[in-house]
Amino acid sequence: MAKKSSSRLPKRKGEYTYRGKTVSELQELSLEEFAELLPSRERRSIKRGFTDGQKKVLHEFKEGKKVRTHHRDLIILPEMIGQTIEIHNGKGFVSVDLQPEMIGHRFGEFAPTRSRVSHGSAGVGATRSSKFVPLK
């Protein structure tokens, strides 16, 4: 019996590429050229232009300041890679290190707004059968 070759491809150990371009090549592109590489929804969002609040966040990135933002809809651009940002999740700020794999995604995807609830056991009197349980 012959061995079957694995259909899974080996993981590549190399530099990350986005649509065939390395991070350094992406950082050299203008915003319009980078927008052409994005999926249609993100491309359309960038072509419409940034809001005043988003422009302020981008300006803080360029200055190298520590950035805290409520703008969860801002798209991660190549010039942001390697920096840390704090994104509001509705209750507090979540610290996120921006990696090359995050290019083209939005800030809100990395700061979940809902957490899993783990309820404790029911108290005395919570159900009809527990009314007559003697208290210790």
From Swiss-Prot:
One Pfam family linked to the record: Ribosomal_S19
This protein's GO CC annotations: cytosolic small ribosomal subunit
One Gene Ontology molecular-function label: rRNA binding
PROSITE patterns, per database record: RIBOSOMAL_S19
Alphabetical keyword list: Ribonucleoprotein, Ribosomal protein, RNA-binding, rRNA-binding
Record keyword RNA-binding present: yes
GO terms of biological process kind: ribosomal small subunit assembly; translation
Coiled coil residues, start to end: none
Region (Disordered): 114-136
Superkingdom classification of source: Archaea
Entry function: Protein S19 forms a complex with S13 that binds strongly to the 16S ribosomal RNA.
PANTHER family: RIBOSOMAL PROTEIN S19P FAMILY MEMBER, SMALL RIBOSOMAL SUBUNIT PROTEIN US19
Family to which this protein belongs: Belongs to the universal ribosomal protein uS19 family.
Designated name of the protein: Small ribosomal subunit protein uS19
